[in-house]
Amino acid sequence: MSAKDISILIPARNEEFLARTIEDIVNNIEADTEVIAVLDGEWTNPPIAQHPRVNVVYLPVSIGQRAATNLACRLSKAKYVMKVDAHCSFDKGFDAKLIADMKDDWTVVSTMRNLHAFDWVCKCGLSHYQDKGETCTQCGKKMEKKMIWEPRRGTRNYSYCFDTEPHFQYFRAFSERPEGKGDLTETMSLQGSAFMLTRDKYWELDICDESFGSWGSQGIEVAVKTWLSGGKVMVNHKTWYAHMFRTKSQNGFGFPYPQSGKQVDGAKKKARDLFFNNKWDKAIRPLSWLVEKFMPIPGWTEKDLLELKNL
C-alpha cells in the first residue's frame, strides 16, 4: 500500500532489532502511515513479519545509510517522511500527534527516551543491563539476552546542539530557559535517530547528502539545513520515542556499518566546511545567526561567535 500521511524510512544493515522496531511501529500508528525498510546488504534476522503497511527492499550490496534512506524516500508518496533508526520503540499514536502540530517548514522530533531493549541473563542467576557486556562477571560464561523493550525511567531529552568542531552535544541548559518550556520547543540541532519533515522539503534541502558519506553528522546536517533555509527544528513534547544507544560489539550490539575515525571525521569536516564557511547554496541565513539565536551554547564562546561572523 502507499500511505498518504507518513512514510517511515528505516535504513538497516544487519539490525537484530529491526523486526521488533517495525512491529512496534505497526502496533502504535494511528494515522495513514507506512514503513519502508531498506535491508542494506544484509538480510535481517529475525525476519520481518508481513504486513500491508510494511514495505521491505533488499539490496545485495550495501550502499550506505544515507543512500539507503534516499532510496526509501524515493518509494514514498506520503506528505511526510520520518527517518528512524532500526532499534526504537514508540508512543501510542505518535504519528498522529506529530502531524497534529506540524508545519510545512518544520523538521520535528518527539521527546527522545533511552530504550531498555534487553538485559543480559546468565544461567548462574546473574543479570545486568544491556551495556554491561555478554560475559558473566560471576562465572565467566556467555550470557543470553532477555527482551525488555521499554523506555528507561527518567530518560527524556528535549534539546540538542553542536560545538565548534562540530560535535553533537546534549543541550540540557536550554530546557531550563523560558523558551525551552512548553509542549513545542525549538532545538538548535538533532541527535539524528529520528526526525520528520515533508517529503518535498526532504528533497528540496537534500536532507541526506550522500557526499557526507554513509554515516556521521546526520543530526547536524538535517537541523542546520532546516534552520538556514528559513525553517524551524522543533521538539514535540506531547509524544515520545525511545532509542537504543549502541556501545561496543563485544557488549552484544555494536554498529552495523563499518565505523572508522576517518569516516566520522570526514563527515564533520564536510559539515564544517559547508556550513561554517557559508557554502551551502540554499541558505538564506548564515550559521552565525543560528549560533547567536541559541547562545549561550556549550562549546561556544563569544569569541567563537565573532570569528564565525567574520568568516
Describe every region a protein language model picked out.
Residues 81:
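Short aromatic/hydrophobic "clamp" motif used to bind/position activated sugar donors
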Residues 23-33:
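Short, acidic, metal-binding catalytic loop of nucleotide-sugar glycosyltransferases
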Residues 60-75:
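Glycine-rich, basic loop-to-helix element that forms the pyrophosphate-binding segment
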Residues 126, 130-136, 140-151, 164-182, ...:
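Terminal low-complexity segments of carbohydrate-biosynthetic enzymes
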Residues 1-24:
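N-proximal low-complexity "stem/linker" segments adjacent to membrane-targeting elements
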Residues 98, 188, 194-195, 200-206, ...:
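A short, conserved alpha-helix in the catalytic core of glycosyltransferases
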Residues 89, 93-163:
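Conserved donor NDP-sugar-binding/catalytic core segment of glycosyltransferases
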